Amino acid sequence: MLLLLATFTMQAQTATAIFSKTLSTFKAAGVVSAGYSMGSSKGTIVMNGSKFRVLANDLKAWYDGKTQWTYSKATGEVNVTSPSPQELVMVNPLAAAQSIKAAYNMSATKTSAFYLLKLTPKRKSNVKSITLYITKGGYQLSKAIYTTAKGSTTLKISNYKTHANYPASTFKFQKSLVPAGSEVVDLR
């Protein structure tokens, strides 16, 4: 029994170390750009610290560290908000990643190319588990599988580039990237 407990503790420490290394590698990468797909949604994301821009077929979002602009194809509107830290966790990949340690238990396994981190919620949640595929060579997220009672959803990351060159204006609303006539609704 003691050996089983020691193995579980070591596995959790290894998973936490891999997750921490992945997060620190991301933070040190400067401006990061990547493509992604999740179900029928495909797009690109550019991140610089807490700032981000997402351009997808059904959604566009910008966050400059203070103000968030979100365009929804379904409503044809751009909503302008000053999100709280809790709201940022829902849309900002870095904020979401930083909240994982507190909200999930972690375990790790290895394949030839990836560390697989299995995250299970510490409290009751709609999410049963999240499996993160972290590249062994670069500690970069390659894929995430979200499992709920209703099934699973896979997020795939492609064309991951670090130290990308994007101006500060990348993280502010760009009217030219939404259809002409889209209503801007200021909810601040």
Describe the role of every protein-language-model region.
Residues T109-A180, V185:
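Gly/Pro-enriched, hydrophobic low-complexity segments
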Residues T44, L59-K60, N105-S107, S129-Y133:
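Short, surface-exposed charged micro-motifs
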Residues A29-G35, N48-V54, S112-K118, G138-K143:
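Short, hydrophobic/aromatic-rich segments at coil-to-beta transitions
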Residues P83-A113:
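Flexible, surface-exposed loop/linker segments and immediately adjacent secondary-structure boundaries
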Residues K42-V91, T148-T154:
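An acidic-aromatic
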Residues L4-K42, V46-K51, G76, F173-R188:
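N-terminal leader/targeting segments and the immediate start of mature chains
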Residues Q13, A34-G39, N48-A56, N92-K101, ...:
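Short, solvent-exposed secondary-structure boundary motifs
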